[in-house]
C-alpha cells in the first residue's frame, strides 16, 4: 500500500467518524426534545412498541376501546409489590407520579361485559389478543391473576397491551379513569 492510498483511507475514516458523531448528537438532541417538550411520552419497555408517542389530550374525560393512554396507578399494596419486583419504575417530579406512568391500551370501558381469567380477557364476547395470563413472572415468582365476570362499572376501564408478557389488567384488574393522564398516538415507534 502506498502513501497516497493510506492518506485517502485515513481521510475516509475521519469523515466516517465525523458523520457517526454528528448522527449521535442529532439522535440525542431529538430524544431530549421529545422527552422535555411535554408533547411526547417515550416507551423503551417490552410491553408496547418502543419509541415516542404524541400526546393528543391531557386528563381525558372519555376514553374508548383501543385508544392508547398513560396512567399513574394508585399507591396500593399490589402496585408497591410490582414496584419491588421491578415491573414498574420509580417516577419523579417530571412525571408527578410515584412511578413512571404506564402506557396501555384501553381494552374495555364502562358498560362492556368482561370475563377475565387465566385464559384471557373476553370483552363483549371477543377474546383480546395476547390477553392470556402467565402463572409466573420471568423470575419464577407467582403472578396474581385477575378474575372478573360482569359489566365494567362507570369510571373504570380495563387496560391491556399487545404483548404476551405485559404487566396490565390481566394482573391488576380494573383501573379508575381518574388515574388516566393522557391519550397518546404513536409518533415514531419500532419493534
Can you say where each PLM-predicted feature lies in the sequence?
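Protein maturation boundaries and topogenic segments
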Residues: 1-101, 150-151, 170-191
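Short, surface-exposed secondary-structure boundary micro-motifs
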Residues: 58, 74, 119, 162-163
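Solvent-exposed loop/turn segments at secondary-structure junctions
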Residues: 77, 114, 121, 165-166
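Acidic/glycine-rich C-terminal interaction modules and beta/coil loop segments
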Residues: 131-184, 188-191
